[in-house]
Amino acid sequence: MTPTGLGYIPMVVEQSGRGERAYDIYSRLLRERLIFLVGPVNDATANLVVAQLLFLESENPDKDISFYINSPGGSVYAGMAIFDTMQFVKPDVSTLCTGLAASMGAFLLAAGKKGKRFSLPNSRIMIHQPSGGAQGQASDIQIQAKEILDLRERLNRILAENTGQSMERIAIDTERDTFMSAEDALSYGLVDKVLARREDV
């Protein structure tokens, strides 16, 4: 279950009484219930994350899943597939920003279980409204415009619920790109704690 588009992926060799077994690093970490969203949110990455969430739920429905995010965002539809699955599965999904959680990446970061949403100290978080392009006849453009406005309303409502901010504040802050430090994201309610070391968890 390797994230796509990462080039060379290191292998880990484990030895046991039954011999050796090689895993790519992400498959090995999946055994520890760690999932990664690295790079853009698209159908391919969303399908991988959804499959891994469902797999880990089937393995143990009572043990937390850790979801590491380093993503500039991407497709709203693909991101909503991940979001809905995070809410659907029984285990708590803990989120951690490593590097950048922008756009849909920030939305998914905030969607983790309350009290279990983290950021590393030098990570950056960015929220904004969904964007899209439309072409074709005027009626087609009108349909697309309505869809993007509906998506913006839905995303803002969920973000308000997850952060404790008002809908009005979310609407203002997502009007343009709003970048935040890890501490800013903590104050805003996107994360619950900034972690400098593992023992801080």
UniProtKB/Swiss-Prot annotation:
UniProt EC number: 3.4.21.92
Catalytic site positions: 103, 128
Catalytic activity, as annotated: Hydrolysis of proteins to small peptides in the presence of ATP and magnesium. alpha-casein is the usual test substrate. In the absence of ATP, only oligopeptides shorter than five residues are hydrolyzed (such as succinyl-Leu-Tyr-|-NHMec, and Leu-Tyr-Leu-|-Tyr-Trp, in which cleavage of the -Tyr-|-Leu- and -Tyr-|-Trp bonds also occurs)
Any one GO MF annotation of this record: ATPase binding
GO cellular component terms listed in the entry, alphabetical order: cytoplasm; endopeptidase Clp complex
Keywords assigned: Cytoplasm, Hydrolase, Protease, Serine protease
Subcellular localization, as worded in the UniProt entry: Cytoplasm
Main location: cytoplasm
Keyword Nucleotidyltransferase annotated: no
The keyword Protease is assigned to this record: yes
Any one biological process term the GO annotation gives: protein quality control for misfolded or incompletely synthesized proteins
Known role: Cleaves peptides in various proteins in a process that requires ATP hydrolysis. Has a chymotrypsin-like activity. Plays a major role in the degradation of misfolded proteins.
Family: Belongs to the peptidase S14 family.
PANTHER family per UniProt: ATP-DEPENDENT CLP PROTEASE PROTEOLYTIC SUBUNIT
Binding partners and assembly: Fourteen ClpP subunits assemble into 2 heptameric rings which stack back to back to give a disk-like structure with a central cavity, resembling the structure of eukaryotic proteasomes.
HAMAP family hit by this protein: ClpP
Record-given protein name: ATP-dependent Clp protease proteolytic subunit
Organism lineage string: Bacteria, Pseudomonadati, Pseudomonadota, Betaproteobacteria, Burkholderiales
Gene that specifies this protein: clpP
